[in-house]
């Protein structure tokens, strides 16, 4: 009730923050005259002075005004660009660990230099994170002269970079790279076998460009390093032949069945479900195909894998469409990012869905993979001591940024007021009427000489629009994932008078559409242009620029609304940069997916009440409100999905932290002998307690079982029954001591044979390998648990609580298994002295072989419906490690040593 009054009296929180920062801006401006008077050498020397002051106890906050003044002056001298006052506010926002929302063309890249320079003074490193390699290289090379002028080093990390080059990049004061590469390097570091192999330092401060894209759109995408699993390509092909025989079951709203079928599709949640008839029919077909035994059920425990394949095939055929969710290029299925319209090379759908699409498209089916290490962007970026970001559209997601990342959003005032006109949406009954209206708008704008950008949600729509324009004889350019290599060229001239560009959502995030076209691109196209040619190109551009401004600037036409208001705002933001004139209009129809699924009934009834005729449009605030309400509903649902996924992943994340801390401690330790002694004692105690329960009577002892366990776990054949027969005073405690002495003596003899130093090195290698192998199996077990945990809801149990409880139990088992398996391998192994040079060369060869056989990919985000985790088709960023195969014994065969373990878990790890 009082909120509007208080806001009027004191201003919004954002306005109060801006006022607070303006006081600091005044202090920065007061330093300007002093900085102008400094020579280049003196200005450069300020960096060393700041570092010295930090070492003496000053804080970065105390240095901020003077450091910003230094960065501003350096920008003027090196780049020819002076930071505006509002850009200083943006820099302060980033330094304070917030998200700066700045409109298109307000100079986000330049804003970043202020916070990056200030925080790099600490010497702990700053990471500048971008969405792709092109932007990382462009921004790093663009700003490198500024940072190097100020005495700071700049590095770029990228995929397939030589290890030494990558380590040097991470050791730099400022490191540029993509979110994927930073995340993968974190996982690689936690699979390293020595400190020297690691890349990253402690994660200090990150500035994320297009932060909404990375922390919101990519939040559900796990980063995974994986190894190859067994080949199931024949099964995918067989099931792909059966799926087209299934038909969809359709019901009207009143519950009237209009088509009997085998499965239902829920478009809102993007789920497909087999009904009873569908289950029966698919089981019959699988039995006829010889894939399911006669009388067997798909729901039998040993057939659940087959059921997963059936659902993957069904989703591939019914939910994933060519040129909408993916394209086929060079014999590969390339996924399309729904938020940007760009292809995502290397990214694959999980749970067999990608293979099912490959089978559908008659392509070569790539092998499935097994997870070796994983994390999510949500959990990776929360590891930084301080996090900040920049984007043109964050305010609509402010609640999510705050609740998940503890990041506040600051809307930075524009340097010049916005002059763009955003017209109300026009809604038509059919898509054909909508396209006819768009073409009429295009023709009208072209006669005025205005550049036009038509935004579409899919490649399919962009190509349909292009075909309509060809029929009308209208010249245009198409920009979508199929023609992404021409992106820079098309965007450069999209602002020329009368230029018409049809684009998916990829339309130039990170690039500006300049009114009149881009004169710099014209100059770059010439070989050794003369000063006269450059001057002429500039003069011609100035005329075109003025012509476009007088015509009304860039006109943005959207062919439909996206599920997210943020994506719509990004498209609008292409027009009206830095106070330029412009306009935007959204054209919709009741046949659009958003309208059909979420908003159609109310709007359709409203249009019927008005008695609308074919070709007529409705332009009313009620309609716009209904659409925005539908978008908020979708955004809220997607937020719930991301939040719920995070709650589940947080469980795995806590375990990941423990394992990675254990691993890093091992790598850092010179000697793990004491750890092995502790492990040996704990494993022995547990083994004895299993067969001789504490405070039990001798009649209850399982001596034969204890002898067998000691032979299996410690490679010790000890005559315990004989000892007991010969010594009446050998009780439980004295027996424990005797066994420990025997086992310790045997291991000491091993030390004497191999040499203490060699054995300590060997112990570390074995413990690391056992830990990695068991962690990999644990991840797989956790994955299976997560897939089926929603079923606990039917037993009136809370799936999240059950998941936490069972995960904890599994983790306890993992920690015990690490100890037990390490001791088992070390006890069974036969050691010999090895020449130190030979040993080092062997370890190096193994490390190089491991590195050369690793591969990386990305997998799609799982969707959640209420408590159900549906991770079929989850997108993943994945890196695959080698699978070792022994020539004599299969990895899954029993080990020759008689331990009862599989060869891969025993001597297969060290031979």
UniProtKB/Swiss-Prot annotation:
PROSITE patterns: SECA_MOTOR_DEAD. Zn(2+) binds at residues 895, 897, 906-907. It is found in: Cell inner membrane; Cytoplasm. Its cofactor is Zn(2+). May bind 1 zinc ion per subunit. SMART domains: SecA_DEAD (SM00957), SecA_PP_bind (SM00958). It is a peripheral membrane protein. Its EC number is 7.4.2.8. GO terms for cellular component: cell envelope Sec protein transport complex; cytosol; plasma membrane. Keywords: ATP-binding, Cell inner membrane, Cell membrane, Cytoplasm, Membrane, Metal-binding, Nucleotide-binding, Protein transport, Translocase, Translocation, Transport, Zinc. It catalyses: ATP + H2O + cellular proteinSide 1 = ADP + phosphate + cellular proteinSide 2. Pfam families: P-loop_SecA (PF21090), SEC-C (PF02810), SecA_DEAD (PF07517), SecA_PP_bind (PF01043), SecA_SW (PF07516). GO terms for biological process: intracellular protein transmembrane transport; protein import; protein targeting; protein transport by the Sec complex. Its main location: membrane. Monomer and homodimer. Part of the essential Sec protein translocation apparatus which comprises SecA, SecYEG and auxiliary proteins SecDF-YajC and YidC. Part of the Sec protein translocase complex. Interacts with the SecYEG preprotein conducting channel. Has a central role in coupling the hydrolysis of ATP to the transfer of proteins into and across the cell membrane, serving both as a receptor for the preprotein-SecB complex and as an ATP-driven molecular motor driving the stepwise translocation of polypeptide chains across the membrane. NCBIfam families: PRK12904.1, secA. This is Protein translocase subunit SecA. It comes from Pseudomonas putida (strain GB-1). The gene is secA.
